């Protein structure tokens, strides 16, 4: 079932499976979101939780304090992208998705949690907020959360990919870990300079 929010500038279509966007169009009908092509990438905008990226052989080991270690299996980018969320409309331009841990999830991720994702249109922008709650006060809950949207680029004729860039809210300086695309693994100990007091990141196919 398609879930639609809109304002005078944008219309966004989403689905309950994975609480993910499936279309972003402007008032001129221009489609901004990648429409999924398995030749390149069949996804569109998955939500990543409780891990981002991959762990070796999909195997995670939990070592809680004063308790035996526990082993679970979590696929690349986590499991909520394959789960159906509940949802409710906040307004014509905003929708909220929620999901809670299930018995099935607890088999491999032994933490009771709730995840709430809200999409809100603000003029020509989409604000996305994430609220993760640990429902077990007696123990810490390790997790990561991320967004993985794909966009059509270029959007218009006579444009090229390199005409586009990402712009951050403020100037950023950071390093990134060594990556291994074939496995999706990262070497967190081997880091390389990436941004140096930059607010914009130019796009390229490297």
Task: For each feature predicted by the language model, list its residue ranges.
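Beta-strand-rich recognition/accessory modules
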Residues: 1-8, 101-102, 114, 199-206
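Beta-strand-rich N-terminal accessory domains
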Residues: 1-66
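Hydrophobic residues embedded in beta-strands of well-ordered beta-sheets
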Residues: 3, 22, 94-95, 126-128
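Acidic, contiguous internal or C-terminal segments within carbohydrate-active enzymes
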Residues: 5, 101-149
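Acidic/His-leaning functional-site neighborhoods
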Residues: 10, 74-88, 194-206
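Short, hydrophobic/aromatic beta-strand segments
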Residues: 23-25, 138-145, 177-179
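Active-site/ligand-binding surface loops and adjacent short beta/alpha elements
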Residues: 67, 140, 153-206
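Extended, loop-rich substrate-binding clefts of extracytoplasmic carbohydrate-active enzymes
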Residues: 70-123
């Amino acid at each position: 079932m398609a879930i639609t929010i809109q304002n005078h500038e944008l219309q966004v279509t989403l689905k309950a499976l994975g609480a993910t966007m499936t279309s972003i169009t402007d008032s001129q009908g221009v489609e901004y979101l990648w429409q999924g092509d398995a030749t390149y990438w069949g996804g569109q905008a998955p939500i990543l939780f409780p891990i981002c990226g991959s762990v070796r052989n999909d195997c995670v080991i939990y070592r809680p304090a004063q308790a035996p270690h526990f082993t679970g299996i979590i696929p690349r980018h986590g499991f909520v992208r394959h789960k159906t969320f509940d949802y409710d409309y906040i307004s014509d331009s905003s929708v909220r998705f929620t999901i809670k841990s299930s018995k099935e999830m607890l088999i491999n991720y032994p933490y009771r949690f709730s995840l709430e994702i809200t999409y809100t249109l603000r003029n020509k922008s989409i604000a996305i907020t994430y609220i993760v709650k640990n429902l077990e006060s007696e123990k810490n809950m390790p997790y990561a959360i991320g967004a993985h949207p794909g966009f059509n680029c270029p959007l218009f004729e006579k444009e090229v990919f390199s005409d586009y860039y990402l712009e951050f809210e403020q100037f950023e300086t950071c390093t990134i870990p060594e990556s291994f695309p074939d496995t999706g693994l990262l070497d967190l100990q081997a880091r390389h300079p990436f941004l140096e007091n930059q607010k914009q990141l130019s796009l390229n196919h490297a």
